[in-house]
Design a protein with these regions (language model features):
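Terminal low-complexity/charged segments
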Residues: 1-134
Length: 134
């Protein structure tokens, strides 16, 4: 069974950690964000060693005021994930190798995932069967 690690890190350590994984031959698998409070977000960067199937997840906690350094200079494919984080969460990623400047997704609401939930969802009424033909 593959080992999966979750490692707490900081914005200041993020680029150096990505460089270390690149130097060891690990691939960048993904980066995602989640809203973790009123102005708190969690970023998760995943790296994989294909030889051993080991996975390392770097966890970084940020606020909307933070500037997130891009790892795109190390792993060029990161531009997709970083643009997604910017567009969906409104977070600032600096020094992206390909910056869509908010146009990666065409959204009706700016940064929809950064918005606080608007209350409990209302249940959808069950569909009523159509009346039988006479």
């Amino acid at each position: 069974m593959a080992q999966v690690d979750f490692i707490e890190t900081t914005l200041g350590e993020l680029v150096g950690a990505a460089q270390a994984y690149k130097a060891k031959g690990w691939r960048f698998a993904q980066c995602c964000a989640s809203r973790n409070g009123d102005d708190a977000f969690e970023l998760l960067y995943s790296f994989v060693d294909d030889a051993t199937n080991e996975v390392a997840n770097l966890r970084v906690c940020v606020t909307s005021a933070d500037e997130i350094p891009s790892v795109g200079g190390i792993y060029p494919v990161a531009f997709m994930f970083e643009n997604e984080i910017h567009d969906l969460y409104g977070l600032t990623v600096v020094d992206m190798n390909l910056d869509y400047r908010g146009g990666f997704y065409h959204l009706h609401i700016p940064a929809p995932m950064a918005q606080a939930p608007q209350g409990k969802a209302k249940p959808v009424a069950a569909a009523k069967p159509a009346a039988a033909a006479e």
